[in-house]
């Protein structure tokens, strides 16, 4: 979901002079799933220098925006490869979006993702979040793509 990225987006908004234009690509299964975030999405859309791109997985009555999966939409939008990418979402979306970003020319140190879905106790005791020699709760939950590529393919 969008919640883990809200603070970083707001930080960048507050320090816009250091970051330039921000491109947000937000996908959900249906337009109804966007309702929870509609207030903050509208706030970001009203902000000069923020480009908000919304997509839903399948056509739906009353939706006139983009329809399609996030990895494909990212390729269509062809984001600036000199920028940094921060993303979160279901593991399957992350996997295919990472592949698409690499195809577009992003290098492995420009892409950050979160793996908090694997956490349970969040203090390193239960071992549920262990991937290879890393504990998501202690070593993350945010990882660069190059760090992920060093881990076993469990995510």
Residue ranges and their predicted role:
Residues 1-120:
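FNR/FR-type flavoprotein reductase catalytic core
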Residues 92, 116-141:
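Local cysteine-cluster metal-coordination motifs and their immediate loop/turn environment
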Residues 143-155:
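Short microdomains enriched in Cys/His and/or Lys/Arg
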């Amino acid at each position: 979901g969008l919640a883990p990225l809200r603070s970083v987006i707001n930080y960048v908004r507050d320090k816009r002079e250091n970051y330039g234009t921000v491109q947000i690509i937000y996908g959900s299964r249906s337009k109804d799933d966007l309702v929870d975030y509609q207030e903050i999405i509208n706030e970001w859309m009203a902000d000069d220098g923020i480009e908000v791109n919304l997509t839903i997985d399948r056509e739906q009555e009353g939706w006139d925006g983009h329809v399609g999966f996030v990895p494909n939409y990212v390729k269509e939008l062809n984001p600036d490869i000199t920028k940094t990418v921060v993303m979160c979402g279901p593991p399957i979306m992350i996997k295919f979006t990472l592949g698409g970003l690499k195809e577009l020319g992003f290098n492995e140190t420009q892409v950050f993702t979160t793996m908090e879905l694997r956490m349970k106790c969040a203090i390193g005791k239960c071992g549920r979040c262990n991937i290879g020699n890393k504990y998501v709760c202690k070593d993350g939950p945010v990882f660069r793509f190059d760090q992920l590529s060093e881990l076993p393919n469990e995510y």
